[in-house]
């Protein structure tokens, strides 16, 4: 079949004026037409198809001009005055030979010659005009191919280069019989040659034709050759050309033009991944993704090598992304908080989840939700006990080995990450990076509701719960709920009275290790902040600033209900509970509630019998400090 395709071109007959004359009897279009089967048409290259089109166009137009078009059935043959593209659709369409069983060709882009006559009208070629003249013989021809054939016969050459032929046609297209210009009927423009007018008129015709067929003739000839076994597949394929999208998902309103694509798209919502790699077990939503994975990861050589560390990667894109770990490049910047990312996927996930508050991955065991799927997978190991790494010092368990190694530094005292600005050292690199933002003033996590910014993402997430009202951490003893797990753990120590961190100097106990470290500065006088007014020392600059308000009388925090002012914001928050009626601190023994935590602690001493305040004169003990102060006045009055 391939050999037949190579010799197809010379067998196409060319109709000349000498061949078509009314005196020679009726000649039908069928007599000179050449038809190809679907298989034969597929073997032609683009140049051969173009030649077929041009020859058939010239033959058909020439026969129509001399009135010899008799190949049309009588009931469909129009009059000479009304000959149009629609009336000769049968004569213009080449037969596709024996049809393929159950084959349905795409009607939008099939490669057939159904636009021969329309193209002739579109180009504006008139049969009685002969714009092509032979320089050698002076003979005139209606078509360039006739001129070329005539010149080949005169010179004996069978092949003329395309460049020489084009130049010859351009130089010989003027009509010397008249000095009249050729006007365009659509716009006020004249042309000295008929060829110039014809070329100009194609611009108008193309626009009209684009409205009729949504594509130009040239695009339709070479765009699509797809053949389908079932009619339903043709219908779905034609939606590619029409833009129709028949399948719509109700939840999100996304439209797709194929049922297959619609089913594949639904997997993104139900997390179905039916295509599993038989080598590594990784699953994928789409079959083509699985094929690409197997070719890229398991079969293809890793030919892209990083010059920094020597790591080999399977694609140039992966190499570019990997090199960002060395050069620190983070090209994807969030326009909300300014945070930058190395990978586009991480950037998109950040925008979709962090700022919207969406947490789509929910643990089926405890109901806790997560932003990323890998966070949920990591969390589920808490329930399954999978891959737990236990500390030999304290027995604490970790999901990852690296987390255990980091934890060991607490026992060894190793702090390898040191701040170059202040010399402070940290166990984890992440903590160092967060600490450095104190020096730079960077606060990349910005709340889109109130505009407050944060150094750490954990602080930002905890702050978001203030707006949402979410209190996911509930005390099992009293039912009180908290925004963060850390706050819940602190609260638990109220019930257990646990103060595991004890000062070796004075024996005072603390709930948290950080509080003990702050307290120990008082004994070591390390980095103490002293008040210039009274000489009192504080372990933190923040505490000193709060204390100095005592001397200045500054009370910047004012209650909007009653106008009362306070030195500290925490005092204002506690005071506002008087107006709201909120009493969050409940006694577990008698269910009495209090506004302030210290009042609850004092009250609980009634039940426990604890009396920590002892008089130095008589040894009498009290459960409240002010009771001791009032008692001591008795001894003052007794003194002479």
UniProtKB/Swiss-Prot annotation:
UniProt signal peptide: none
Zinc finger feature spans (C2H2-type): 217-241, 247-269, 275-298, 304-326, 332-355, 361-383, 389-411, 417-439, 445-467, 473-495, 501-523, 529-551, 557-579, 585-607, 613-635
Keyword Repeat: yes
One GO CC term on file: nucleus
Family the UniProt entry places it in: Belongs to the krueppel C2H2-type zinc-finger protein family.
Chain's role: May be involved in transcriptional regulation.
Protein name: Zinc finger protein 549
Biological source species: Homo sapiens (Human)
